[in-house]
Amino acid sequence: MSCIIKTESEIKKMRISGKLAAEVLEMIKEHLQPKISTEDINQICHDYIVYKKKAISACLGYHGFPKSICISINDVVCHGIPSKNQVFKEGDIVNIDIAIIKDGYHGDTSKMFYIGKTSILSKRLCQVARESLYLSLKLVKPGIPLYKIGEIIQNYVESNNFSVVKEYCGHGIGRNFHEEPHVLHYKNKKNNIILKKGMIFTIEPMINSGNPEVKCMKDGWTVKTKDRSLSAQYEHTVLVTEYGCDILTWQKDEDISQKLVNIN
C-alpha cells in the first residue's frame, strides 16, 4: 500500500479546500428546519460551493452520483441522495457530507444535525459518534500504526453499547477523492501502516444504535441499517504533523482544538 506524502505546496492547497468544506457545514446549519426538502438543502450547498466559493462539488457525477452533497437521515448510514420528495421532520437526525474540489485538491467532511427536538437515544448516538472521532484524532501522530485509530473507535463505541459499521472506511485524500490508505474504524492489525508527517486522510466513523449490518438500496447509493436502527457519522480530513495532527476541516463551533499536538 503506497501512501502519498504531501508537499508543502499541496498541504497549503488542502488547507484551503478543507476550510471551504467546513464553511459549507457552518453555512447550512440555519437552513435545516422541518418541512424543508433535502433537495432544497442540496441546491443551497451547490450554489454556495460553485458560485460563492468558486469551487467544485466532488460528489456531483462521482461514479454517477446525481447530487452535490450526501444527506443521510435516521437509519440511512451514508450516501443518501437528496430529493424534492424527502422533507425533514421534527426529531430527525441528519448527516450532511460535503466534499469539494478547489484548485485541484479535495476537502471532505461531515457532521450530524438535529431537526428540532430529538430523542435521548438520538442525541446519545450522535454524541458517541463525535467523541469516537475526537478520541481517534488525539492519537494521530508520526509513528502510530494505522490500526490504532480503528481500535480506539471500536472500543469506545462498543463500550457505549453501539456498533461500528465495517463496510465503509476513511481514506487518503488529495488530488484524488479517494487515495491510500484505507482508514478502518475497527481494529485490524493487518492495517499496520505507520503514520508519517505529511500524510492526509479522513477519519469518518459510522455507528449504529442497533446491529452493525447494513444494506444498499435499489438506487445503488443509499445505505441503510438492516435492522432500521439509527445511524450517525462524523468526519474530518486530517494532516499528520511533526507531533500530532491538524484538522483541516475544523469548524468554528467545535469543542476540540484545530491543532492536536501529541508530544508524549
Curated annotation (Swiss-Prot):
The enzyme's E.C. designation: 3.4.11.18
Where along the chain is a divalent metal cation 2 bound? D108, H171, E204, E235
Q: Which domain of life is it from?
A: Bacteria
* Recorded catalytic activity of this chain's protein: Release of N-terminal amino acids, preferentially methionine, from peptides and arylamides
* Cofactor(s) this protein requires: Co(2+); Zn(2+); Mn(2+); Fe(2+)
Described by its record, this protein's role is as follows: Removes the N-terminal methionine from nascent proteins. The N-terminal methionine is often cleaved when the second residue in the primary sequence is small and uncharged (Met-Ala-, Cys, Gly, Pro, Ser, Thr, or Val). Requires deformylation of the N(alpha)-formylated initiator methionine before it can be hydrolyzed.
HAMAP family according to UniProt: MetAP_1
Mind telling me what this protein is named? Answer: Methionine aminopeptidase
